[in-house]
């Protein structure tokens, strides 16, 4: 019987992906009572970025795309069409962090570099999605709106991501729960 080690097992990958999806659905409840805090801390972003480093690009992209749409369908937050733009943003976070995860083994600098590249790529995709979605409804999406939504209002969440994601990835690797 050929059994893959736990850290290479597809069962582990599926389990971690399911946990990350569940966290993406539940974490916003911690900040959801005050919408301004919730949108500033970006709680759905954390499990998707983590999923990329743990499970790889395809699983994390799927978790990232499904999470905001499923949460919108079940809990009506984020509201449509914001959930659609978030789906593309989080899908990009998962995809890019997953594609760069093997580089992140080299050093802490590579881990941060991979994380920052994923965060920038996701925010750019969010901006493009907003332009397309709002363009379809004859609304405008300005550079000021992009700056406010992707950067200025998200600074607390960006800081939390830059602190927590590397700590969690390194802790899981040290515990041999991630490769």
Residue ranges: model-predicted function:
Residues 1-54, 58-62:
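Hydrophobic transmembrane alpha-helices
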Residues 2-6, 12-26, 63, 83-131, ...:
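Short helix-perturbing small/polar motifs within transmembrane alpha-helices
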Residues 26-42, 66-100:
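Interfacial aromatic-anchored transmembrane helix boundaries in multi-pass membrane proteins
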Residues 33-38, 42-43, 76-84, 104-179:
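Membrane-embedded alpha-helical hairpins and interfacial helices in multi-pass inner-membrane proteins
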Residues 58, 66, 124:
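Gly/Ser/Thr-rich beta-alpha loop segments that engage phosphate groups in nucleotides
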């Amino acid at each position: 019987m050929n059994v893959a080690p736990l850290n290479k097992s597809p069962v582990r990958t599926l389990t971690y992906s399911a946990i990350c999806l569940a966290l993406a659905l539940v974490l916003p409840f911690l900040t959801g009572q005050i919408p301004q805090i919730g949108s500033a801390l970006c709680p759905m972003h954390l499990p998707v970025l983590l999923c990329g480093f743990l499970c790889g690009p395809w699983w994390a992209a799927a978790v990232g795309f499904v999470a905001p749409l499923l949460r919108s369908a079940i809990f009506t937050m984020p509201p449509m069409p914001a959930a659609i733009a978030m789906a593309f943003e989080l899908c990009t976070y998962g995809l890019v962090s997953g594609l760069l995860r093997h580089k992140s083994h080299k050093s802490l600098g590579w881990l941060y570099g991979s994380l920052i590249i994923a965060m920038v790529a996701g925010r750019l995709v969010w901006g493009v999605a907003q332009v397309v979605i709002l363009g379809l409804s004859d609304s405008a999406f300005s550079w000021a709106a992009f700056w406010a939504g992707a950067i200025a209002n998200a600074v607390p969440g960006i800081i939390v991501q830059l602190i927590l994601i590397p700590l969690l990835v390194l802790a899981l690797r040290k515990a041999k729960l991630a490769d």
